[in-house]
Amino acid sequence: MIRRTSGFSLIELLTVVAILATLVGLLLPAVQAARESARRSSCSNNLRQIGLAAANHESARGRFPVGAESRQWDERPDFPHQFFRWSVLAHLAPYYEQEQLLRSLDLSVPLYVGLSPGDIAPQNKPLVKLTIPLFLCPSDIATAVADLFGPTNYAGCTGSGVDGGSPFETNGMYGINSRTRPRDIRDGLSKTAAFSESILGAGPKATTSPDGIEPATGYGFTFATPLTAAGCGRPFYYNFTDLRGFSWANGEYRTTLYNHARQPNGAALDCLSALMTTPDKSRMYAGYGWRTARSRHAGGAVVGMADGAVRFMADSVDPAAWEATATIAGGEAAPLP
C-alpha cells in the first residue's frame, strides 16, 4: 500500500512567498505613513503646548515673553548684554504644564557668566543640559547635538526678515527684548505665526566649502551685518559649527529664533552672521539670521499661530503669503496660506 504525504510543491511555496512579499510591500508604506502621521501629530501637539504656555504667560503678565533676553548684569556692568541670552522657551518655563524641573531655572543671572561656552551658572548648568521631550519633534533625531545643552526643534518667529535678519525691533512676535501684546498683533492672532519647527544639526563638518552640507542641517556664515543677498550667496565659512537647534535655553537664530525670509525647507543654506565689532555692549555678539522653518515631514512644516492653533505650511506656499504670516502688523493683503 502506497501512502501519500501531503505538502507543498516548490511552485506552491514560491507562489506563497511571492504573495507574502507583495503584501508586505503594500502594507509597509502604509505602516510607515501611519507612524509618520502619529509623529507629526505629536509634533503639532508640542507646538500647541508651547503656544498654550505663551498664552498663559500673556494672561499672567499682560504680554508675550521676550524672544531672547539682552540686558546689563549688575554684578558686571562691563559684561556684554547678549550673554544673558535666555530664550523664549526658557522664559516660558513657569508655564509648561508637564515640565516642573524647568521652574527651577534662575533667569536672574546671565545664561553665560563668563567668556567660555562652558561658563554657565552652577544652579543652571544641570538644567540647561536637560533633553526635554516637549522641545523635540519625534520625526527628527531627538538627540543632543552639544555636550552642555539640551536640544530643541522649535523656535519663535521674529518676522519677515526683510530688515537684514536683525533680531532687534523685529516685525514679528519675537526678538531680542520683544514685549509683544495681543493688541500689537493687528493682523490678527489667528493669522500670525508665533512658533515653528527646525531640524537639528548633525555635528561640525566643512569650514570652507559647501560641498556635502545639507541646507536642512547646516548654515552659511557671512560677515555681512545686516545680512545681504550678496553676502549670503557667497559666505566665507560654511557649517562652521553646525549646531542648529543645539540649545533650547539660548535665544539666537541658531537655536530658538527663525523668520520667513525664505520658504519652508528651502534649498538654500540658511544664513547667519554675528555683530562682533560694535562698541555697543547691548548689541555686541548679537546674531543676525535668515533662518526658515524646516522639518522631517514630507512637503512642509508645522507652524504654531499666535492664537495657539497649529497649521501645516507647505513648502510651495506663496512667498508673499508666507511673509505676511510672519508679521504682526504688516496689513498685507495676501491670503492666509
What spans do the regions from the language model cover?
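Internal low-complexity, small-residue/proline-rich segments
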Residues: 33-337
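N-terminal single-pass transmembrane signal-anchor helix
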Residues: 4-39, 43, 49
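N-terminal leader/signal peptides at the extreme start of proteins
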Residues: 1-10, 71-75
